[in-house]
Amino acid sequence: MTPLLELKDIRRSYPAGDEQVEVLKGISLDIYAGEMVAIVGASGSGKSTLMNILGCLDKATSGTYRVAGQDVATLDADALAQLRREHFGFIFQRYHLLSHLTAEQNVEVPAVYAGLERKQRLLRAQELLQRLGLEDRTEYYPAQLSGGQQQRVSIARALMNGGQVILADEPTGALDSHSGEEVMAILHQLRDRGHTVIIVTHDPQVAAQAERVIEIRDGEIVRNPPAIEKVNVTGGTEPVVNTVSGWRQFVSGFNEALTMAWRALAANKMRTLLTMLGIIIGIASVVSIVVVGDAAKQMVLADIRSIGTNTIDVYPGKDFGDDDPQYQQALKYDDLIAIQKQPWVASATPAVSQNLRLRYNNVDVAASANGVSGDYFNVYGMTFSEGNTFNQEQLNGRAQVVVLDSNTRRQLFPHKADVVGEVILVGNMPARVIGVAEEKQSMFGSSKVLRVWLPYSTMSGRVMGQSWLNSITVRVKEGFDSAEAEQQLTRLLSLRHGKKDFFTWNMDGVLKTVEKTTRTLQLFLTLVAVISLVVGGIGVMNIMLVSVTERTREIGIRMAVGARASDVLQQFLIEAVLVCLVGGALGITLSLLIAFTLQLFLPGWEIGFSPLALLLAFLCSTVTGILFGWLPARNAARLDPVDALARE
């Protein structure tokens, strides 16, 4: 009869400083299907090391070990995990149940790594627990179960994938005598069902219940009676076979990994929340700065547009502050007419201004009087609360009419409901009020100077008595480049004057400068916020590294029941990403709350969230989870299962 487990000259040594300590010294052993074997020996005899090699948790330094004729030395880590998953079931002295899972969920774990569908897995777990007398304890956590009940859950887990070979390490060592007898009775039943049962113990009474007792001392077998030949041995229940297609198996495996990650995080709620806090603050900072910064930029640009966008101002002289008399009369009315004829000009308004006194009854105030055309108010985005602007007839006839700003109206007519038609003195000239213009509120504040507007012809001819203009404002048509229009305007006036005795000021240039400045400032603030996100990511990595250390034994348990290194890597990586994703969602929620609060206090601001910004936030949190979760996950996947199981 061919042995199920065959060991030939197995040696296992470990480094101890500069030397090698040999724990197993040429072990040769055959174990047949259906046997109940006890391996006994004192502490330090090498029996646990032998069990680890038998269960494919450890590899021999030299020698040959075959499982059902297959040489274990030729298998890689994933193939060894498959071998453990399909052939072996482990029963540990300390049960090694996962504390955050129920009895039923603990039993399901091996089948999760076997890729069994959830429904089949659940039915099998319930069936095994019922067979072991725990049908009313399926939803209990390990802490709610007695030692004997926990060991029965451990046995059910060992049988989940078939458990052709049951490896029991001191199965009664942590139990009272009654519970120990129950566990041994179950092991006898498993032997009777065809399972191969290997018990590692130092208790002679437990060993005596086996059909064959193998004694090991100082790494050598000192007693190995011949196996009792068995007939009609089925080799235990057949291994669980996964018939699910590759794609469905991948999706199912990912969903299970996600579920396990969520359970692990939920088991330490406070720590998970504190870990998320860095991500929450980081994402909220990034999103808030981007969104609020964009709203502030739009507000600034709107203020600049309210002054007049796509406009070019022309002034006499070389530059601002130039009061040279030879340039004072550089701009003429003929220049205005020539400019208005250009194809790229939407409108052009002249401006002549002077500080004058305004009088109405016994009220006397100082104001800036400006001579303009009717287009002036459209150019600067001004609206009328009362009346209207000048018409062409009033411009041509030098009509004695005036438009007030809202501050002037309040000073001159504090108690009048309608001021259109009232007559005031502008300097010494009577003028009838035809409108009240409302200037757009600016975040830069309003001017303290009272302002009134008259037709430029009236201002020049009747008030100031001058034939030249103080400035000309040109509005460029939509679709024309403002910089190109400025160059053409400069060429036109230079040709007309025979020299360049004027200078221009392009509002579009100011707009671009402000856009660049706000974009730079927003980028700087975003980088500061990203730093907080990186700090949050480092916090996630730190906690995950601590988690790997704390859960080392859990990792060992998962590997013992058949988890591959990639399964462990996936689980811890998903945990890190899950922390960051949930933190990202909470961070976005916090940023929405911040935006809503700001909207209440700053009603003029238009704060909005684009789908792209939200998508980028989620992408950012996912990338953070992957980047900062990779190192802890890799460390977890690289753990040796024997060392992991031995860790307390």
From Swiss-Prot:
Residues in compartment: Cytoplasmic: 1-272, 544-575, 632-648
UniProt cross-references to InterPro entries, sorted A to Z: AAA+_ATPase, ABC3_permease_C, ABC_transporter-like_ATP-bd, ABC_transporter-like_CS, MacB-like_ATP-bd, MacB_PCD, Macrolide_Exporter_MacB, P-loop_NTPase
UniProt topology in membrane: Multi-pass membrane protein
Organism of derivation: Escherichia coli (strain K12)
Molecular function via GO: ABC-type xenobiotic transporter activity; ATP binding; ATP hydrolysis activity; identical protein binding; polymyxin transmembrane transporter activity; protein homodimerization activity; transmembrane transporter activity
Taxonomy of the source species: Bacteria, Pseudomonadati, Pseudomonadota, Gammaproteobacteria, Enterobacterales
GO cellular component: MacAB-TolC complex; membrane; plasma membrane
Record annotation: effect of changing residue 47 to L: Lack of activity
Name used for this protein in its record: Macrolide export ATP-binding/permease protein MacB
Pfam family, one: FtsX
Notes on how activity is controlled: ATPase activity is stimulated by interaction with MacA and inhibited by vanadate.
Principal localisation: membrane
Swiss-Prot/TrEMBL keywords: Antibiotic resistance, ATP-binding, Cell inner membrane, Cell membrane, Membrane, Nucleotide-binding, Translocase, Transmembrane, Transmembrane helix, Transport
